[in-house]
């Protein structure tokens, strides 16, 4: 198991942090604004 070998630990940690950061950036810039826009539009339509 490479997770337990100290030589690979920093590589796995760096890759994990990088992957989570990219995923968080993608979700925050593309997915959340579209979902928020959809929810606001639905609320406006319901209130009409």
UniProtKB/Swiss-Prot annotation:
Q: Does the keyword Chaperone apply?
A: no
Q: Which Pfam families match?
A: Fun_ATP-synt_8
Q: Identify its membrane topology class.
A: Single-pass membrane protein
Its GO CC terms are: mitochondrial membrane; proton-transporting ATP synthase complex
| Alphabetical list of InterPro entries matching this protein | ATP_synth_su8_fun (IPR009230)
Localization, per the record, is: Mitochondrion membrane
Family affiliation: Belongs to the ATPase protein 8 family.
Q: How does it assemble?
A: F-type ATPases have 2 components, CF(1) - the catalytic core - and CF(0) - the membrane proton channel.
Q: What is this protein called?
A: ATP synthase protein 8
């Amino acid at each position: 198991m490479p997770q337990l070998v100290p030589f690979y630990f920093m590589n796995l940690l760096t890759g994990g942090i990088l992957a989570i950061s990219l995923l968080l950036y993608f979700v925050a810039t593309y997915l959340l604004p579209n979902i928020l826009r959809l929810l606001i539009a639905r609320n406006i339509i319901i209130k009409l």
